[in-house]
A protein has these predicted regions:
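Short beta-to-alpha transition helix within the HATPase_c
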Residues: 1-15, 21, 71
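Glycine-rich/acidic phosphate-handling loop/turn and adjacent ATP-lid/helix
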Residues: 76-101
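Two-component histidine kinase transmitter core
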Residues: 87, 112, 130-135
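Short beta-strand/loop element within the Bergerat-fold HATPase_c
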Residues: 63-76
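Glycine-rich ATP-binding loops of the HATPase_c
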Residues: 111-119
Length: 136
């Protein structure tokens, strides 16, 4: 999963290099092997979150940073954490059903996961879902 996320980030950085060249990524990703179904859904969610941060979060941020983390607990629950140090999002903006939010919702449902957005020195996203037997 770590190498997949690195490739994904490199592709997104190349696409948006003209918008924010100071952007730094912090990865805290356990060695996790996921099936293509899980990896694709997480990749799509990650892409939407990073794209949103790059486009909207860092206008007033001198040293923009995005943190991405994955961990699995003893109950086989994968937790995906995403945060940026941008300007955050007003609660009412999180309720809007723009395309990015719909995609995040669709892929989270595909994973049968529970997710939440919140502000904590920027936008934060947390997704929990159970890795089914034989599909990790």
């Amino acid at each position: 999963m770590f190498s997949y996320i690195n490739v994904l980030i490199a592709s997104i950085e190349e696409t948006f290099s003209n918008l924010n060249s100071n952007l730094k990524f912090e990865l805290n990703v356990e060695k996790i092997n996921l099936s293509p179904i899980y990896a694709n859904a997480i990749g799509m969610i990650t892409t939407e979150l990073i794209t949103n941060s790059i486009k909207h979060a860092f206008q007033d941020t001198s040293y923009p940073k995005i943190a991405i983390g994955f961990s699995i607990n003893e109950d086989n629950v994968l937790t995906f954490l995403y945060s940026d140090n941008g300007n955050g999002v007003a609660d009412f903006d999180l309720l809007k059903k723009n395309l990015g939010m719909r995609l995040i919702s669709i892929f989270s449902r595909q994973l049968e996961g529970d997710y939440q957005f919140y502000n904590d020195n920027g936008l934060c996203f947390k997704l929990n879902f159970v890795l089914k037997n034989g599909k990790s």
